[in-house]
Amino acid sequence: MSSSLRPAYVPPAAFLLIAGVLAAIAACATPRAATLSMPLRVDYELLDSLPAQPIDYESQVRPILESRCVVCHGCYDAPCQLKLSAYEGIARGGSKEVVYDGARISAADPTRLFIDALTTAEWRKKGFHAVLDEAAKDPYQRLDGSVLYRMLRLKQLHPQPLTGRLPPGIDVGLDRKASCPTLAEFDDYASEHPQQGMPFALPNLEPEQYQTLVHWLAQGAPRSAAEVLDASVAEQVATWEHFLNGQSLKERLVARYLYEHLFLGSLHFSGQSPRSFFQLVRSSTPPGQPIVPIATRRPYGDPGGPFFYRLRPQPGSVVAKNHVPYELSPARLEWLHELFFETDYAVAALPSYEPEVASNPFRAFAALPLRSRYGFLLEDARFFIEGFIKGPVCRGQVALNVIEDRFWILFFDPDSPLASNSSYIDQLAEYLAQPIEMEDNLRLVTSYGHYLKLENRYLEARRKAAHLALPLPLDRALGLLWNGGGTNPNAALTVYRHTDSASVDQGLIGEPPETAWFLDYPLLERIHYLLVAGFDVYGNVGHQLNTRLHMDVLRMEAEDHLLAYLPAKVRKTVHDGWYQGIRSGEAEDIVPWWMDVDLVTGYQTDQPQQELYTHLLARLGPLSKSPIPRPCSGRDCDSEARPAALLRADQAFQKLSHMRGKFVEFLPDVAFVRVVLGGAPEADLAYTLLSDKSYDNVSSMFSEQKPGDRRDASGDRQTVLPWLEGSYPEFFFVVPLSEVESFVARYDGIQNRDDYERFTARFGVRRTNPAFWQAADWFNAQALREQPVRAGILDLNRYQDR
């Protein structure tokens, strides 16, 4: 390296003498200067080994960022809004403003990467500070002036312990306060928080990884050349953009409906690379020109002028917590054409973008056949439920404690008499309005009361519109529920809630839950618009709490559909069991007319809810899942044909699914287990242990763990899955096959926190464990092996310090 690139060379002996004198002087002046004296701030050895050839971002830098940095810096809740999942996120830098702020009085300006600003200069105007030195011309200054480098260097200078828990004072809680220092503030930050370099609260980078990142930063953080779309992919993009940009009123209305439901998706072309995805956006430029996205808070916001629907390659890394894939294919295109264009109907005018119309899909899309709309949603029901599980609304208790820890979802058949009666839905559209039409406001009590009245009017009008001969025999009532034609696995879903995150799987998984949702078209559509299309993560406290309160109403309606299937004599007992404790009166706000009227007859036992679940499992047949023992068919069910290691591990873990009681409160909500077989790593087995916490009710907005409020620890249990489930693992366990029975026995023997700590010390992978990254890498690779299209980078923000 040229002498012009850094201070003049100093012989080692003289350097040590000078460094000692400088350190002594600095010690007399201020402890901060001693902590971060100049020789420590920059790695001269790495500057001396700086390669002449540029470090390639895509092939050399991005894999390191994805495996070590994106695990925490990948979404709205990335610390300091520093999104390291894309080069543009690094160039944008960080911000002291937080996205998730449920108490703000005024809505915040949106800061969505690739949408709300397109250049670094625009982000600076929005208050983002650089983490790269954007002006430096020599390697030394590029490092010394880079907050990102200084964070990495701080961790090198102050590595964390190699055993035990993290040092006191390091907060890894979800709502921890972030410092987000600028370059001018960094010396103070490093002095006050010397053990909070990057990776934060996790082991250091490997030397080769650290060297690659430092060399890349010293070279000026060059980016790779933009990728060119493969010809076959470009052809499919052109086909879909042509379909979405038709000029007739019918084509434009259908395209708007599709956009407002798919805007959050990771669109994948069948037959292409499993890691290639696109996003559907509105652009001011037509197909064939560079995309210029139109930034509106919500997908139904007024575009303000002419626009085109465009498919944009999904930029950046695929992150599990916001990855909701949706397949595009020639067959899908043909199906959509048949669904929306081979039905006889007319569109006389396009709906406005005024909030009271645009936020109400029953008004905006009244011209589209109800059967087509509902069929579109049912075909990929998991995608639309995942929208609110993985969308911006997903983070935190205020959003998710409206749901149970595990419950099933089923759907009414689109061809049943009530579901196919579009006339009454059109007539009741005004009653189906939701608080999202008011956007940001602080009228919490009056808003809740207003929309609750609309809900009751809707339910009463719906009762009058139901032309069913009641009561129905059980077999006929079961026929009103969709079975997916016997082939569509979206006919039944299981939702797992993990305190402040959640996940969705196909099938009825685990033991029969306390509650289930039976959804019809109006419910499914309202959930999407309330929690996905209409939810603004940058909105004020009024918007966020009104959203949460109204979701309570929708959840109760969905659960009431289950109650309607039960005999009248048990409904109140079941209903009251869902709403105990401090919120016992809340459900009385909605009083179903049928609570004392038998609607379904033919039960043969004194446990009708369990009997109903048994019938549902039988009706769905292979579409319901029994995780352990694993499903099999033919010779595969012969124990001699199944690997002995798999049988041994499955038999051991099956015992955990029968665990009950208060011990669960000591366990992580989501734990990943790797059973090491001793051969190739990819042959090892993966399990997920989910804690199903029991609650007196799920209607309290806050105070998740206040004793006596909502928790009923005696009803806690475990769900064990022979695959990886969840985007936010809270702990890893690595178990040799030879110890799998011991692992289960000790797990089953946990009675208190001390027992759990001893168990963790033997089998767990703590944040301080030098093998932590090896474990994380294996689980990320395993997720890709299990689901090549659906998998994304796991998020470690919720990983516990135990």
State where each predicted segment sits.
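N-terminal secretory signal peptides that target proteins for export/translocation
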Residues: 1-10
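Bacterial N-terminal signal peptides
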Residues: 13-26
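Aromatic- and Gly/Pro-enriched helix-to-coil junctions and flexible linker segments
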Residues: 28-802
